[in-house]
Every structure is written in structure tokens, then in C-alpha cells.
Amino acid sequence: MYAERLTDRYEVHVLTSRAIDYITWKDEYAAGEEMLNGVHVHRFSVAHPRVPADFDAINGRFLQGFLEPDEEEQWVEEQGPYLPELIDYLKAHEAEYEAFLFCTYLYYPTCMGVKAVAKKAITIPTAHDEPFLRMRIFDDVFQKPKAIFYNTAEEEKFVESKYHNAAIRSEIGGAGVVLPENVSPDAFREKYGFTNYLLYVGRIDEGK
């Protein structure tokens, strides 16, 4: 969504994995580059897929308070997607780009990518109050970027109270959605045969 909307003003490149499944991060798409809806997409191979049992073990130790600070990098690598070649690309090509947008603080590409190109980094953290923010390894994601783009005022207030980073330039904007041309609650009820219903907005995921 961000990438396609920016193509009106910029040449946009997306650096991403070859994965579809975020549980294992297994390579599925072809490696290399392609043009997709006006966006240059660069796909990098996952150096090692996530083994759910291994991640559950180290994550369980963290949640129980037994993870040492020097083990946090291992946690981030197990969290994935583990893409050291993507980080190498950032370092090698930093001068070719005006800015780097990193979306969602919790994953390896953002955690390590912001450190690699902090002077040009714009973080879109999508942060909320959860245990993983106790990890010191994420501090740079919130304290080192050139700018931060928050989804809500509540997120901004929460992050600034935790990381004392109000001096970093920030804006609030959300992610945006593409609305259908014709939206009719009556047509929805007729199509599905519902009278009363609960509308869920979000991805279909067991954890949600």
C-alpha cells in the first residue's frame, strides 16, 4: 500500500523476503528483482527458515524472564525473517536512496536495517504495549531513525513515554485502505443472509 501510493512522486524499491508463510519464512517466491504495479521488488533468500520449536523455546525463555541481554540478537534472528543479504544490500547501496522506510518494529529486517542506515531511516513501528518492547535490542528502532511515522496518536504517546524520543521528527497518518466504489450494508445482509452480525477488521490469523 505505502509503496504503490508513493510511485506518483518517487521511484520506489521494496526489499523483502521470498517467503509467504510468516511461521517458517520458507523461500517460495523466485529470488531476484521484478516490477510489480510500478514498484521495483527485490526478493532476498532467508538464510535459515524459522524452526517453530526453536523459536518457541527461546521466546518462552524470554517471556519467563530468563533471556540474557546478549541473547536478544539470537531471538531476533529466530523471529526472522533472517535476511543478512538484505542488510548487506542496505549498507552497499545506501547512497543510492533518499530514504528507507521500515515497517513494523518486531522483525529482523527493521531491527537490523534501522541500525544499518539510521541517518536515512523512517520507522513505521506499529507498536503497542507488549512484552517484546522490554528488549534493549529494539531501542535503536525508536531512538536512532531520522523520522517516525505513527498509525495513531495513542501509539505516538506510548512510544514517546517509553523511549523519550519526542525530539525525533514524527507524523501520524495510518496505513490507508482502498474502499470499494459501492458499499451497502443492505446488500451485504442480502448476499449473506445475515440480520445481525459482528464485523472483524484485520488479517485472518489464529493469534488474532
Name the predicted role of every residue range.
Residues M1-S45, A95:
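N-terminal subdomain of nucleotide-sugar transferases
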